[in-house]
C-alpha cells in the first residue's frame, strides 16, 4: 500500500547515477544519490563547471546516465540557461499557447496568459514579437511558459543569469 501511494506522489530519485560526456574519461557526475519526495522549492548549488546543468538535464531526461537509475514520475518543466535554446514561436502569446493545456475554454486560456505575463512583469507583451525582446524579457517569457504548463516540478538552470534578480526569487517562490 505504501509503495503504491509513493508512486502517486510526484518524486525524483537518483541511485548511483554517473555521467560523462562523449570522449571524456572522467565522470562529471559520479555515483550521485538523492531523492526529492515531493514538489517544493529546491536548489542545486555549486561552482561553475561542477555539473549543475548536466544534473538538470539528467533529471529531465534530456540526457541519459552512463550508469545508475533515475526513477521519476514527475511532470517536469525546464527553463534553460539560454532562453534562445527553447523559444520556438514568433510572439509571446504563441509561445505560451504551446505550453498550455488546450482542453480548456478560450476565456480561461486568455486569463492564464494574462496571469503569467503579469507574474513575470510582462503585462501587455502578448502580441510582442520574440525577436524584439531583450535577453531578460526572453528569460522571463520562458519562466512564464513553465508556470502556465502546470508542471509539478519546474527546473530552472541559472534563472538569475540575465540580470533581473529582483523579479526571479519572488516569482519562483510564489508558484
Residue ranges and their predicted role:
Residues 60:
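Helix-to-loop junction immediately C-terminal to a conserved catalytic motif
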Residues 146-147:
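ABC ATPase C-loop
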Residues 129-133, 137:
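Conserved ABC ATPase signature
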Residues 107-125:
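Conserved ABC ATPase "signature" region
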Residues 2-14, 18-31:
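A short, flexible loop at the N-terminus of ABC-type nucleotide-binding domains that lies
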Residues 45-47:
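The feature captures the beta-strand-to-loop junction immediately N-terminal to the Walker
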Residues 154-158:
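Catalytic Walker B motif of ABC-type/P-loop ATPase nucleotide-binding domains
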Amino acid at each position: 500500500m505504501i509503495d503504491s501511494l509513493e508512486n502517486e506522489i510526484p518524486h525524483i530519485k537518483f541511485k548511483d547515477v554517473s555521467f560523462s560526456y562523449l570522449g571524456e574519461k572522467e565522470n562529471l557526475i559520479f555515483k550521485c544519490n538523492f531523492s526529492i519526495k515531493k514538489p517544493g522549492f529546491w536548489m542545486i548549488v555549486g561552482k561553475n563547471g561542477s555539473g549543475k546543468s548536466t544534473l538538470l538535464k539528467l533529471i529531465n531526461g534530456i540526457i541519459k546516465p552512463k550508469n545508475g537509475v533515475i526513477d521519476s514520475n514527475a511532470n517536469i518543466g525546464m527553463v534553460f540557461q539560454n532562453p534562445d535554446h527553447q523559444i520556438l514561436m514568433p510572439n509571446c502569446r504563441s509561445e505560451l499557447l504551446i505550453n498550455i493545456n488546450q482542453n480548456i475554454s478560450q476565456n480561461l486560456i486568455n486569463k492564464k496568459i494574462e496571469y503569467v505575463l503579469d507574474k513575470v512583469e510582462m503585462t501587455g507583451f502578448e502580441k510582442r514579437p520574440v525577436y524584439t525582446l531583450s535577453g531578460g524579457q526572453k528569460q522571463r517569457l520562458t519562466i512564464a511558459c513553465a508556470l502556465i504548463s502546470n508542471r509539478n516540478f519546474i527546473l530552472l538552470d541559472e534563472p538569475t543569469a540575465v540580470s533581473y534578480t529582483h523579479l526571479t526569487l519572488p516569482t519562483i517562490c510564489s508558484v
